[in-house]
């Protein structure tokens, strides 16, 4: 069999960005259900127009085999992350590839890793970066994952292992059935937190813009030493979340208040599969996966001084009860690092069980 001609290019044109951003439509073309990328936002990031790029050095790479685009990845130096953690860690984001392209992917990885090494990075991570990258699924390959999470093909793991990456962290995704019995327990959790002097308000009740700013500040404080996190700013979060004000996000997301001050926050979304997922006609989603019946708690945090009063549980419970009022039958609790036992115990107390597993990869350089 004739060898294919492999070519690796740095992407630096509008047409190139467009082609880069649309590769997932080939990778997942045969899937019954998947989350397509926001092509416009991805092009803004690649071209340096997104606010977050003020903190990044970013270079997208594309792999071509016999002239056909078959794989992509972006090499990133996130200065804000490295300053926060005092590390020299590079990131590989946007990774997607077609099947049976081992040679092209190997060449792509080496080109991107060399780019990071030349910028002084001593390690590379793929599969976790705040607002930039999410971990790789290791099960449920044929199913629609929770909102924001990857539903990658299984062969991606061979690509990373062949590129000498190792698993750095595991993560889990939870799902809770919103049964009448568990709803009673949720109300008890809320009452217990209220008895300590805490109040829980939806973002709509708190004021949506004020809630966005509170969420930003609380998340920065609560996640300050959380693996993989880096600080974010109100200026970059506001334009991302303000468009959600007219949606159910305002009713499902919560702010925990103690002594008049916001000390806890939950960001939750309704079932977005009907609006954002790419679904093959005539194939229904399982109710615990979507189809209008699965909300998701995406982020939860409580500042250290307000912990140990059950506020995280109570905010999640309030969010899940709001989902019930809007006809949702299942709630996701997404995404928890394997060894984050406080958050895992919170999920379990809410009646949730692990329904998806994910990993983040790392490779030392050179």
Task: Spell out what each predicted region is.
Residues 3-6, 150-228:
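Acyltransferase donor/substrate-recognition loop-hinge adjacent to the catalytic core
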Residues 24-65, 73-83, 210-301:
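A conserved beta-strand-loop-helix scaffold within acyl/acetyltransferase catalytic domains
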Residues 83-164, 283-349:
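Acyl-donor binding region in acyl/amide transferases
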């Amino acid at each position: 069999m004739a060898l294919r001609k492999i070519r690796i290019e740095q992407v630096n044109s509008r047409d190139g960005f467009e082609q880069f951003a649309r590769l997932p439509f080939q990778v997942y073309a045969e899937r019954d259900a998947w989350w397509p990328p926001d092509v416009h936002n991805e092009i803004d990031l690649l071209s340096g127009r997104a606010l977050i790029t003020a903190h990044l050095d970013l270079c997208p790479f594309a792999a071509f085999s016999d002239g056909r685009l078959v794989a992509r990845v972006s090499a990133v130096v996130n200065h804000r992350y490295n300053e926060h953690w005092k590390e020299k860690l590079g990131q590989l984001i946007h990774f997607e590839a077609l099947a049976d392209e081992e040679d092209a992917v190997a060449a792509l990885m080496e080109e991107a890793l060399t780019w990071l090494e030349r910028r002084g990075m001593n390690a590379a991570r793929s599969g976790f970066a705040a607002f930039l990258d999410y971990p790789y699924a290791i099960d449920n390959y044929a199913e629609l994952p929770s909102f924001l999470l990857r539903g990658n093909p299984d062969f991606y793991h061979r690509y990373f292992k062949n590129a000498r990456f190792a698993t750095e962290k595991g993560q889990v995704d939870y799902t809770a059935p919103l049964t009448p019995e568990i709803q009673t327990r949720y109300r008890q959790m809320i009452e217990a937190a209220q008895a300590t002097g805490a109040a829980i308000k939806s973002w709509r009740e708190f004021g949506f813009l004020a809630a966005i700013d509170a969420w930003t500040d609380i998340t920065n404080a609560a996640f300050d030493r959380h693996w993989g996190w880096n600080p974010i700013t109100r200026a970059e979060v506001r334009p991302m979340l303000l468009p959600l004000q007219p949606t159910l996000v305002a009713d499902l997301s919560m702010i925990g208040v103690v002594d008049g001050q916001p000390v806890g926050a939950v960001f939750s979304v309704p079932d977005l599969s009907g609006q954002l997922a790419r679904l093959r006609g005539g194939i229904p989603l399982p109710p615990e996966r979507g189809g209008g019946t699965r909300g998701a708690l995406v982020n939860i945090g409580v500042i250290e001084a307000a912990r140990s009063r059950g506020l995280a549980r109570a905010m999640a419970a309030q969010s899940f009860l709001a989902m019930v009022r809007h006809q949702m039958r299942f709630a996701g609790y997404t995404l928890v690092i394997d060894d984050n036992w406080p958050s895992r115990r919170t999920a379990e107390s809410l009646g949730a069980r692990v329904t998806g597993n994910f990993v983040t990869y790392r490779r030392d350089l050179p």
